[in-house]
């Protein structure tokens, strides 16, 4: 019994061991099968494995532009402020009560237009008095002259002494002097009356009124009645570095007016175009700049006094210049360079000499020719002689459309 019992346990143990061995054998085969595709894929991707490993990687995508030949203007730029050609504070020349205002705030007026009236009563009275005194003295003079004529006849017969004749002559001369004084008084009174009507001294735009009708005003008031700014034409005062003076003077010697453009604060919109008026006669030693004044017609009222603008003055135009986008110009240890594409879309580095430059384009004086293709984007991935793929610039709209399409595709896959 004991022998048969031991035999059964031996059989059970052998079966368990066989089952465990079979399980490990089956698990090992599954692992080798799942590892085989990965190994194959690695072999395909390995540079030394299979035909696919012998193929080159994808070409670097770049954007390119063609160098063109064109006329390029040269501008000098500066910051400036619009100033009125003339600014006049309209004040009363006489004292009195303000009776009427004949303008609308902000309107354009012409020189001589009536702006305000002061009560003329006192000035009319003064004029009448002066005219009356003049008439009286004229009558006195006429009588004195008649007496003088009689004295001149009587002195011949010794009925009147020579002394009396001289006295009468002096009286006539004195009265003539009084007449001149009276005439001046009349003119002064008339002037005072005229000044009670206040007119515009210059063409321009009136500002806000400084006094209301009914107030007593005087010639000593500093605030005045209203301020007129002449805006047709209007001036731009800006500064240039002293190093640009020679360029401006040389351009002026050509005999043509230099064009000055006024751009808005963000330098994105041209407001108006005028001409150079003058340079200041001295340099500001503190800033090393010189003041420049330009004049604009401003019939469209695009410019306003005290407005901040960016000024651009055209001083020269470079003809037949080779121009490329500014993004293509790079700077290295050897100097400025660009990447040039040949007919096989292989790139090579060309050292260049840049000229006039702005945020959009740059003139190349030496190093490339018109018609050469230069890389403008994807430059950081380039090496000498590398072959690249030239792609078109992708607009923001296109990017948004593609992103939207991908989002719809994801939603469709989830649904």
From Swiss-Prot:
Looking up Pfam families in the UniProt record yields: HlyD_D23
Q: Which residues cross the membrane?
A: none
**Could you tell me the membrane topology recorded for this protein?**
Peripheral membrane protein
Record carries keyword Kinase: no
Q: Give any Gene Ontology cellular component.
A: plasma membrane
Where in or outside the cell it occurs: the entry states: Cell inner membrane
Q: What induces it?
A: The mdtABC operon is transcriptionally activated by BaeR.
Molecular function in Gene Ontology:
efflux transmembrane transporter activity
Return the annotated region ranges for Disordered.
Answer: 32-56, 392-415
Which residue intervals are annotated with compositional bias (Basic and acidic residues) in the record? 399-415
Q: Which UniProt keywords apply?
A: Cell inner membrane, Cell membrane, Membrane, Signal, Transport
- Keyword Chloroplast in the entry? The reply is no
Q: Which residues form the signal peptide?
A: 1-21
Q: What does this protein do?
A: The MdtABC tripartite complex confers resistance against novobiocin and deoxycholate.
Tell me the subunit arrangement: Part of a tripartite efflux system composed of MdtA, MdtB and MdtC.
Record-stated family = Belongs to the membrane fusion protein (MFP) (TC 8.A.1) family.
Name of the protein in question: Multidrug resistance protein MdtA
Q: Which organism is it from?
A: Escherichia coli O7:K1 (strain IAI39 / ExPEC)
Phylogenetic classification of the source organism: Bacteria, Pseudomonadati, Pseudomonadota, Gammaproteobacteria, Enterobacterales
